[in-house]
Amino acid sequence: MSAKMYYDRDVDTQVLENKLIAIIGYGSQAHAHAQNLRDSGFNVVVGLREGSSSKAKAEQAGLRVASIEDATKEADVVMLLIPDEQQPAVYEKSIAPHLTAGKALAFGHGFNVHFGRIKPPADVDVFLVAPKGPGHMLRRVYTDGAGMPGIFAVQQDASGKARDIALAYARGIGCTKAGVLETTFKEETETDLFGEQSVLCGGVTHLIQAGFETLVEAGYQPEIAYFETLHEVKLIVDLIYEKGFEGMRHSISNTAEFGDYVTGPRIITDQTKAEMKNVLGDIQSGKFAESFIKDAESGFPYMNEQRSKMRDHTVEKVGKELRDQMPFINKKELEV
């Protein structure tokens, strides 16, 4: 049975009328949520820590800014959109003391609730709304009059209206224009982490890096290797995004399609899939969450080491030089 998609026509936004929504943070997702909700006619306040460099940006966008504590006190719905590793401490210090009965606590990702790092009181609603794309794109498609697909979930329904509130929120940021699916905190967290690690981030970047290194080590020009293993990825992914695998294969040459069939299984083997299952197991057991939290609490020594190593890789240096010569690439839209 196909999963049900919810659209604008399925949502009654009256549940959020005359309510105040606090967006905690003003990063990639938060700036888009705040501006989209405001432009949809909802009352919004942005909660930021004292001295936050984001205050000027939020105010420049025409948004009211308050401390996290004051925003939580005032608001009926509190959406926590700061980095996962920062949420528990901010929640305990600045949100929990002011999260009174009848309010709703919302998330863009289920990580901290699912892994027990944030435990909301029983007398508040708890839900998540997660657009399936980066914040700058969420904002762009909204201003273009379109929407971005998303998912929503209810963890706790103290008011009996948590689901309606979640859907109204999803409509406010533009997701129900494209359609939203209902899920659970468990499913959203585990599938999101798996997708990021095995395919979207870990899988893609390491596949590109291995391909680039193979060509360069064989004596080919790094610039040519960059075009063949990294630059053209977007062209293929865009075809898959718009038309699926079949549509993509219809759009490429017979040579490329034949190579796809005979070589793909040599790169992504049964062993690769078996390792993907191990990765999923580490996510489900909480092992990945533990390692992430441990690194975060130590100041991210492992992650900073990896960032430094990747920054010095030839593919990054060559890529920067080539991208600087491509005026059609919009670099500013990635800035928050």
Curated annotation (Swiss-Prot):
Cross-referenced PROSITE patterns: KARI_C (PS51851), KARI_N (PS51850)
Catalytic reactions of this protein: (2R)-2,3-dihydroxy-3-methylbutanoate + NADP(+) = (2S)-2-acetolactate + NADPH + H(+); (2R,3R)-2,3-dihydroxy-3-methylpentanoate + NADP(+) = (S)-2-ethyl-2-hydroxy-3-oxobutanoate + NADPH + H(+)
GO CC terms in record: cytosol
Gene3D superfamilies: 6.10.240.10, NAD(P)-binding Rossmann-like Domain
GO molecular function: ketol-acid reductoisomerase activity; magnesium ion binding; NADP binding
A Pfam family assignment: KARI_N
Entry protein name: Ketol-acid reductoisomerase (NADP(+))
Species lineage: Bacteria, Thermotogati, Deinococcota, Deinococci, Deinococcales
Gene that encodes the chain: ilvC
